[in-house]
């Protein structure tokens, strides 16, 4: 064991006796701290071992290496039964680092301070070192954290690139940025919800007390005075600069400060999960103080550097301007997922080989990391690889000794950034849009570099479909640009690296990587330009965000500024400077805005309030300039060369990325790429999005959408006022304008000037204006109008405008549920991708994907044209594919412009699935709009290039998981959701169902969505082939009322429907018997014309497991059932009739059931699900798999248990909801027709899942169910008379078959749970035998006999209690269901009940007595047994009774299921001949 000072000592610790172990852990990967022992309890096992000390870092538990996760450690510790074997790592002796007065001071009087003080121990054992050079004392100070070991880091998504070939990564030597591993790992693991977590790693955190991550801030050596309340920015920045080489850090730090001073605005906005707070006594804090002390002197000469050299440094560093790594400025926590993958850890400059290898590797990872990106874009990736290789050669980090010496880090994020930005720039130049990777040659879409593509880390950004056509053009331009690009990169690289030799290597690496993507320095070496550009970045952020009514960027800018400068003075200075610049720039931008707005109509003016004008057409070479960029352009006017264009492009790109307008850039690029070739008017469509953003209340998209939209051509087309005050886009036709600094001028010139001046109206006025205009438009169906509302969407008067940029703003304002269901963001993008790769025909019109892509963030605004006759108006369907939740309805075109009253009554969120985005085509007043609109939709959806198949107007087309609370595996269900969403939303090939002709009838479609509707959506998605015919069938049946179709179900509705509804259902079945034969499911729940008042929706979450369990067999069953149904038509009709008659049975028969199982049905049903899964809950993996199956195969989900009133109808209804009405109707009908019996007989015991001893409810239910089934068998005889009239009702048979199958599956689950329980029982018995043997060896024989008797009595008493409670429950149930006339039988039952009650009371006394004996026996046993064996004894006793109860409960459930199964099978086989 190496014992050099400062080296780590690995100490094995073995604790015995079982929990509690007597020590406390703190830190962990979750907190970005090492997992250390914070406390050892006196007298505890850890203290008794005398090997563990506070401050020890856990590295191994029971032979399992730890990788920093506290949760993992806790699981391993809890999993230790009696022996806990640990390996802890502690510093042998503290080492004061060279230049670390802080540590030296700590160590002065305390040689063993490392082991005695929590504070130093944390600092010393912290997995991430403070960035010292690995060559000097770094071995002691850079222990390789277990979390950072190479093989582990390779599992961190794109962090695989951490494994550098030449990088020594051995235990005890931590590479310079281990800290980054923590955020990186976290980001990779949590990318699903922390979209900007990487931004938080790369940008300054928002709170002063929350130091930025190591990578994001390169501490500046300037006079860094760290105040207590504000850790120096460098605290966390495990910058790879070596404190021993002061000169190395000086320049770069100053530059980093100056840089970040300007970028405090952007940096501030990194709004991902905030960095974990850094303890004041942690290594980052001490490191900051060290930097204060030591680097203060080093940086003194450089103090004025920000003022003197700032321009030069910024020229070198501008790329770092947080644009690449911080998607900021109000972007709502949406740094792209790849930001996370490109965690800004120090570049590994160990060698050129490393750099090249990592560069290529990282570029590949960066490309591959987007979760939803098209994997087929290998050609793009190949180009990127080449570019990466070239760049690697260019950026030979290894060639610069300082860079190599100061930091060796396996986390090649800068290379990732290089690769991704190279990809950005390369592909930008190639895509000539400068903002987004063109769609791959194979037609797949690539968004901006992975750094800028996935908002929320999930949406796979996709270009508009038009991108495919543009690809070739972009490709043509690729070569010259790439050459120039590489040349400029090389030049800028050399500039950066030379400038940074004495500077912060990390900075240099970043700068180089950034420059590669930006390529500004090469062509625009002027310091001022870069400086302006940097400032502009921040200003862009400030301006865009602030002008959209969000002052957050400002505050964040201040915070960022405060944090970005190490010393408070410099921070304030930088902040003031940047704020002044921001103010000036903002003023200039506003002036430009005012000028542009004066020349535009009020509508465009409204659109422009979000942002200054963007160029109407952008040449392929340059991305659309944001307003702020436009204001910056004058500084670049003197840069005419193509390289300069590239510079501008990259600058703008970065500016956009700094605002995290990855989406915005995507959309603008998409617009640039696609719209450049599309009619400019289409671009104008995007501006409408800007309008919509105002109403977009959902937090996650407010700023994002505003900015994204603002960036999309707010000015892409001008709007003029038509006599009806409907702003219509005046399409500017100059599509290819040269990309030069004069773009902003082109903006003005290219956009037609509207004659009317408009004054910037306040938000309320704009909103009012939009609402009014939308109303007026909705009421006036002028054939010439292409825009529905003032939406500046490119609405060309095409009979079929696939560019459905719609305009209703209603949804944008309130997405009450959006926030609950944002998680499904990738769904939309999944859907997007499938459409981007559609045929080039769609490139003409910005299709829905473009709507998303161009809108970056505004996925919630899926716009689709609703064609009402000639009026090709576009409406934004706000719950678009994003499945963001309920949204407001479009104003009804047929009503007074307001939402249809019917919809309002039901609080319906009309959702149309027709055009790519669900439009509300059918949602107009169902009576007024039909025919033409439908046909237009059909035409549009069936257009040759239009791969989006029309879809029946149905309620929210959410994946089920979005609506239903998800208890299960969200990730696994995501794929299912995406699949279902893309399928359900867009791939249906069936003709769109004609608009509702009968308003009264189809209003049910638009009731508030219930889970069944959602589930049905899933079902529909996968059962498209079957349902296509159903859709057509629906057209004929459209007039049929569908009573509960879309309503949330309550048990009462299902079980207690009036008989007249049954008669109505029969009538309907007869009317459509032919259709039902071919598609039995089409005939179902049209029994009620007007649904009963809407009950509170049941909690579907409880039914997920049960439904999931029944998934796989459902499809097969359905097919079989359809065949069987035809064969059993008559039988089932009879049974149905019998069911109806049964409803007439005396209420006493059902009284117990109705009161016990029907009313609390909601509660019971969950339990019915639990019957199958309650015990299986222990088999978590199984249930999760079932859930996955459910998510992946929602279509297979058929209501298995009609008995589960709520879930069952839901299940049955789903298919019908989407067209196979029969199934759902059948469910409802059956639920009502085969009255409560069936549904009750299957409703699970109320108390079954509850306290095991409360069996009365359980037995009550089970007996009732059995009786109901028995009676159900007899019902056919009673109902025989009325059966002849009715046709065969095979629906009931189908339901019974489903019930049989579901019960069978449930039984299999229960039996599996029983087997697992038996294993537990056996294990506990073995433990009991061991305890018994130990006791026998140590205690007296009479005492041992007491123990033995106690254990036996405990078993007997528990079984007795269970048996008596069960019998008593059965008797009570019999009493409840007995006929009032059977007095004799009733008396017998009452007497028996009294007897059982007395016996149960005696048994309870016995149990109390046994409990008393247990205490005595425990006192006796505790005298003989050591602590660990005593714990074994306690565990054995406690588990013995619990396992007995659980076993009995499982047995009862299995017995009940078998009874139900038997009864169902018998009733199913009873035919008319048997009566």
UniProtKB/Swiss-Prot annotation:
InterPro entries: ASD2_dom (IPR014799), PDZ (IPR001478), PDZ_sf (IPR036034), Shroom_fam (IPR027685). GO terms for cellular component: actin cytoskeleton; actin filament; apical plasma membrane; basal plasma membrane; cytoplasm; cytoplasmic side of plasma membrane; focal adhesion; GABA-ergic synapse. Residues 1090-1099 have a biased composition (Pro residues). The modification Phosphoserine is found at residues 412, 722, 1010. Residues 1380-1470 form a coiled coil. Residues 1128-1145 have a biased composition (Acidic residues). Probable regulator of cytoskeletal architecture that plays an important role in development. May regulate cellular and cytoskeletal architecture by modulating the spatial distribution of myosin II. This is Protein Shroom4. It comes from Mus musculus. The gene is Shroom4.
């Amino acid at each position: 064991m190496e014992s050099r000072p400062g080296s780590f000592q690995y100490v094995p610790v073995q604790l015995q006796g079982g929990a509690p172990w007597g020590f406390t852990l703190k830190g962990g990967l979750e907190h970005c701290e090492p997992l250390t022992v914070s406390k050892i309890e006196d007298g505890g096992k850890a203290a008794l071992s005398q090997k563990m000390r506070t401050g020890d870092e856990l590295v191994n538990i029971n032979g399992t290496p730890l990788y920093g996760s506290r949760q993992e450690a806790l699981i391993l510790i809890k999993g230790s039964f009696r022996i806990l074997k640990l390996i802890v790592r502690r510093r042998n002796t503290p080492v004061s680092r060279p230049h670390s007065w802080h540590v030296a001071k700590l160590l002065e009087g305390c040689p063993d301070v490392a082991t005695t003080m929590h504070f130093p121990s944390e600092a010393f054992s912290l997995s991430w070192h403070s960035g010292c050079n690995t060559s000097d004392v770094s071995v002691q100070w850079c222990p390789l954290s277990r979390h950072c070991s190479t093989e582990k880091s390779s599992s961190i998504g794109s962090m695989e690139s951490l494994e550098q070939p030449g990088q020594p990564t051995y235990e005890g030597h931590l590479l310079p940025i281990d800290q980054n591993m923590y955020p990186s790992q976290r980001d990779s693991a949590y990318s699903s919800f922390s979209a900007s977590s990487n931004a938080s790693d790369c940008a300054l955190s928002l709170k002063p007390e929350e130091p930025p991550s190591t990578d994001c801030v390169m501490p500046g050596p300037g006079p860094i005075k760290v105040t207590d309340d504000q850790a120096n920015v460098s605290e966390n920045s495990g910058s790879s600069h070596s404190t021993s080489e002061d000169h190395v850090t000086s320049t770069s730090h100053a530059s980093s400060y100056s840089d970040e001073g300007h970028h405090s605005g952007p940096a501030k906005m990194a709004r991902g999960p905030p960095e974990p707070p850094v303890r004041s006594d942690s290594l980052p804090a001490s490191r900051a103080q060290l930097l204060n002390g030591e680097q203060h002197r080093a940086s003194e000469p450089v103090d004025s550097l920000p003022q003197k050299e700032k321009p030069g440094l910024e020229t070198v560093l501008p790329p770092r301007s947080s644009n690449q790594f911080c998607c900021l400025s109000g972007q709502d926590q949406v740094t792209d997922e790849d930001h996370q993958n490109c965690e800004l850890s120090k570049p590994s400059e160990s060698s050129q080989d490393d750099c090249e290898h990592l560069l290529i590797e990282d570029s590949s990872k960066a490309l591959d990391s987007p979760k939803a990106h098209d994997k087929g874009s290998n050609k793009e990736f190949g180009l990127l690889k080449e570019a990466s290789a070239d760049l690697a050669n260019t950026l030979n980090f290894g060639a610069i000794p300082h860079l190599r010496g100061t930091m060796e880090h396996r986390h090649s994020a800068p290379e990732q950034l290089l690769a991704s930005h190279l990809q950005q720039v390369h592909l930008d130049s190639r895509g000539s849009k400068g903002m987004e990777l063109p769609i791959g040659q194979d037609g797949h879409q690539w968004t901006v570099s992975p750094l800028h593509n996935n908002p929320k880390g999930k949406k796979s950004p996709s270009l508009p479909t038009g991108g495919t056509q543009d690809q070739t053009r972009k490709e043509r331009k690729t070569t010259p640009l790439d050459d120039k690009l590489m040349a400029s990169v090389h030049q800028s690289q050399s500039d950066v690296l030379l400038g940074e030799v004495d500077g912060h290597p990390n900075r240099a690496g970043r700068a180089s990587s950034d420059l590669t993507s930006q390529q500004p320095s090469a062509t625009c070496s002027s310091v001022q330009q870069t400086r302006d550009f940097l400032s502009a970045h921040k200003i862009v952020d400030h301006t865009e965000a602030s002008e959209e009514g969000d002052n957050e960027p400002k505050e964040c800018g201040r915070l960022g500024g405060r944090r970005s400068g190490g010393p408070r003075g410099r921070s304030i200075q930088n902040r003031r400077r940047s704020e002044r610049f921001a103010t000036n720039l903002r003023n200039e931008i506003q002036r430009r805005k005012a000028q542009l707005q004066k020349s535009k109509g009020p509508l465009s003016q409204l659109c422009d309030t979000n942002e200054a004008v963007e160029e109407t057409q952008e040449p392929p070479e340059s991305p659309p300039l944001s307003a702020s960029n436009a204001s910056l352009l004058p500084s670049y006017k003197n840069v005419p060369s193509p390289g300069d264009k590239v510079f501008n492009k990259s600058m703008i790109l970065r500016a956009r990325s700094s605002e995290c307008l990855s989406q915005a850039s995507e959309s603008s690029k998409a617009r640039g790429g696609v719209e450049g070739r599309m009619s400019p008017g289409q671009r104008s469509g995007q501006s409408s999005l800007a309008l919509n953003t105002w109403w977009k209340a959902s937090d996650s998209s407010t700023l994002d959408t505003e900015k994204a939209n603002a960036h999309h051509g707010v000015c892409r087309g001008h709007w003029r006022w038509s006599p009806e005050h409907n702003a219509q886009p005046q399409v500017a036709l100059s599509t290819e304008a040269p990309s030069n600094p004069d773009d902003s001028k082109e903006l003005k010139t290219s956009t037609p000037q509207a004659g009317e001046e408009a004054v910037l109206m306040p938000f309320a006025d704009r909103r009012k204006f939009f609402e009014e205009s939308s109303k007026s438009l909705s009421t006036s169906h002028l054939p010439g109008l292409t825009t529905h509302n003032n939406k500046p969407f490119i609405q060309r008067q095409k009979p079929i405008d696939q560019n459905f940029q719609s305009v209703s703003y209603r949804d944008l304002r309130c997405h009450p549920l959006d926030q609950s269901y944002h998680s499904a963001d990738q769904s939309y993008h999944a859907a997007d991708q499938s459409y981007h790769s559609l045929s080039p025909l769609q490139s003409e019109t910005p299709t829905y994907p473009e709507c998303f892509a161009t809108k970056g963030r505004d996925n919630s605004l899926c716009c689709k044209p609703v064609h009402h006759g000639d009026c090709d108006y576009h409406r934004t369907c706000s719950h678009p594919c994003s499945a963001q939740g309920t949204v407001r309805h479009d104003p009804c075109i047929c009503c007074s412009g307001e939402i249809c009253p019917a919809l309002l009554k039901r609080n319906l969120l009309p959702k149309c699935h027709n055009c790519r985005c669900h439009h509300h085509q059918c949602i107009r007043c169902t009576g007024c709009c039909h025919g033409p609109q439908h046909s237009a939709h059909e035409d549009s959806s069936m257009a040759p290039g239009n791969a989006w198949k029309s879809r029946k107007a149905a309620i929210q087309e959410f994946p089920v998981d979005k609506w239903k609370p998800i208890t299960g595996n969200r990730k696994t269900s995501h794929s299912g959701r995406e699949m279902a969403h893309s399928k359900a939303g867009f791939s249906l090939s069936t003709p769109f169902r004609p608009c509702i002709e009968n308003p009264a009838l189809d209003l049910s479609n638009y009731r508030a969505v219930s889970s069944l509707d959602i589930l049905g959506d899933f079902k529909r998605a996968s059962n498209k082939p079957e349902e296509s015919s159903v859709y057509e069938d629906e057209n004929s049946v459209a007039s049929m009322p569908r009573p509960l179709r879309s309503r949330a179900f309550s048990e009462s509705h299902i079980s207690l429907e009036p008989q007249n509804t049954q008669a109505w259902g029969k009538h309907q079945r007869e009317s459509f018997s032919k259709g039902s034969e071919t598609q039995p499911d089409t005939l179902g729940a049209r029994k009620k014309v007007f649904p009963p008042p809407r009950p509170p929706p049941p909690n579907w979450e409880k039914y997920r497991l049960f439904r999931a369990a029944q998934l796989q067999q459902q499809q097969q069953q359905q097919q079989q059932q359809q065949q069987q149904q035809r064969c059993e038509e008559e039988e089932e009709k009879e049974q149905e009739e019998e069911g109806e008659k049964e409803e007439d049975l005396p209420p006493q028969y059902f009284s117990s059931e109705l009161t016990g199982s029907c009313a609390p049905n909601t509660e019971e049903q969950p339990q019915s699900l639990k019957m199958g899964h309650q015990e299986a809950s222990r088999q978590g993996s199984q249930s999760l798999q079932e859930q996955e199956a459910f998510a992946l195969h929602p279509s297979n989900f058929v209501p298995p248990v009609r008995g589960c009133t709520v879930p069952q109808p839901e299940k049955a209804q789903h298919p019908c909801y989407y067209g196979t009405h029969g199934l759902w109707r059948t469910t409802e009908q059956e639920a009502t027709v085969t009255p409560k019996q069936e549904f009750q007989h299957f409703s699970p015991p109320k108390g079954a899942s509850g306290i095991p001893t409360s069996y009365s409810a359980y037995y009550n239910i089970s007996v009732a169910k059995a009786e109901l089934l028995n009676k159900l068998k007899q019902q056919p005889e009673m109902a025989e008379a009325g059966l002849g009239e009715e046709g065969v009702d095979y629906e009931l048979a189908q339901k019974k078959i489903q019930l049989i199958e579901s019960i069978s599956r449930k039984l299999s689950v229960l039996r599996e749970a029983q087997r697992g329980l038996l294993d537990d029982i056996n294990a506990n018995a073995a433990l009991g035998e061991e305890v018994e043997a130990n006791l026998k060896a140590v205690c007296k024989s009479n005492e041992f006999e007491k123990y033995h008797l106690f254990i036996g009595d405990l078993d007997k008493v528990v079984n007795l209690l269970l048996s008596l409670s069960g019998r008593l429950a059965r008797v009570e149930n019999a009493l409840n269901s007995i006929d009032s006339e059977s007095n004799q039988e009733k008396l017998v039952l009452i007497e028996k009940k009294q007897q059982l009650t007395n016996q149960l009371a005696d048994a309870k006394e016995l149990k109390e007595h046994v409990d008393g004996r247990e205490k005595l026996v425990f006192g006796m046993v505790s005298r003989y047994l050591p602590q660990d064996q005593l714990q074994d004894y306690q565990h054995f006793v406690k588990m013995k009774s619990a396992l007995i109860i659980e076993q009995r409960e499982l047995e009862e459930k299995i017995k009940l299921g078998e009874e139900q199964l038997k009864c169902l099978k018998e009733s199913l086989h009873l035919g008319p001949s048997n009566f």
